[in-house]
Amino acid sequence: MTAVLLWGFKMNNKDELLRRFLRYVAITSQSNASVESVPSTKGQTELANLLAKDLEELGLTDISVDEHSIVYGTLHGNAEGPVVGFVSHLDTVDVSLNPDIHPQVIHYEGGDVLLNKEREIYI
């Protein structure tokens, strides 16, 4: 049985971790430079609310999402030591990408990775 550690919580298989990750990346969270408010798109709020729900399921406390879609939560430690904070952003840069997202898992074995066959885009 495979065990994956996510935020200090043991998950019984890597498929659950992958499932969560694919749910996150499937949400259109591109920023909109023409909007002056934060968040600039509904997708950013959707992702923040999903993350808050998942953090609660993982056992974190004091979870909240503020008016700017900033997610807060507390994971209590089990030993004395300094407090650690994690900071990240939910949006992706709007570079006129298609908001219709189709995440894929590629088992990399070296060489170029084909991203778009029609446009011949590789990384």
Task: Kindly give the residue locations of the regions a language model identified.
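Conserved dinucleotide-binding and phosphotransfer motif residues
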Residues: 58
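Short, Lys/Arg-enriched N-terminal segments with co-localized hydrophobic residues
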Residues: 1-10
